[in-house]
């Protein structure tokens, strides 16, 4: 027979953690005042009247730097457990970690040489 009673706490936590956000949205939708008007549609710029049109398109070049940051941040997350158990692990694991670090570095140097990190 299945031992589903072992997971009762999990199911209770899952149900409660699903019901709380739903209740929060429902209660705020019922209690919040609905006010529509020109002030609701205007952009707020630190209490100053906006100058010009707020719907301008412009190129954002930060995505490449954000992507590089995320890659190295994830790499740091994976290297932390390795660093904590460095004395127990052998030389082969050190070489594997070195390769793991070198792959994003080589990719970043390649992207830099190709001009992907240049402002244009």
UniProtKB/Swiss-Prot annotation:
It is an enzyme of class 7 (translocase). Disulfide bonds: none annotated. It catalyses: a plastoquinone + NADH + (n+1) H(+)(in) = a plastoquinol + NAD(+) + n H(+)(out); a plastoquinone + NADPH + (n+1) H(+)(in) = a plastoquinol + NADP(+) + n H(+)(out). The chain crosses the membrane at residues 9-29, 64-84, 88-108. It is found in: Plastid, Chloroplast thylakoid membrane. GO terms for biological process: photosynthesis, light reaction. Keywords: Chloroplast, Membrane, NAD, NADP, Plastid, Plastoquinone, Quinone, Thylakoid, Translocase, Transmembrane, Transmembrane helix, Transport. GO terms for molecular function: NADH dehydrogenase (ubiquinone) activity; quinone binding. GO terms for cellular component: chloroplast thylakoid membrane; NADH dehydrogenase complex. It comes from the Eukaryota. PANTHER family: NADH-UBIQUINONE OXIDOREDUCTASE CHAIN 3. Belongs to the complex I subunit 3 family. This is NAD(P)H-quinone oxidoreductase subunit 3, chloroplastic. It comes from Calycanthus floridus var. glaucus. The gene is ndhC.
């Amino acid at each position: 027979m299945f031992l589903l009673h072992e997971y009762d706490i999990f199911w209770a936590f899952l149900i409660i953690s699903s019901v709380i956000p739903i209740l929060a949205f429902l209660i705020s939708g019922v209690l919040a005042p609905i006010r529509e008007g020109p002030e609701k549609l205007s952009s707020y710029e630190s209490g100053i009247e906006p100058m010009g049109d707020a719907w301008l398109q412009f190129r954002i070049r930060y995505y490449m730097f954000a992507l590089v940051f995320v890659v190295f941040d994830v790499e740091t997350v994976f290297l932390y457990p390795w660093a904590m158990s460095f004395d127990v692990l052998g030389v082969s694991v050190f070489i594997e970690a070195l390769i793991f670090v070198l792959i994003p570095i080589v990719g970043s140097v390649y992207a830099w040489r190709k001009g992907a990190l240049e402002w244009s």
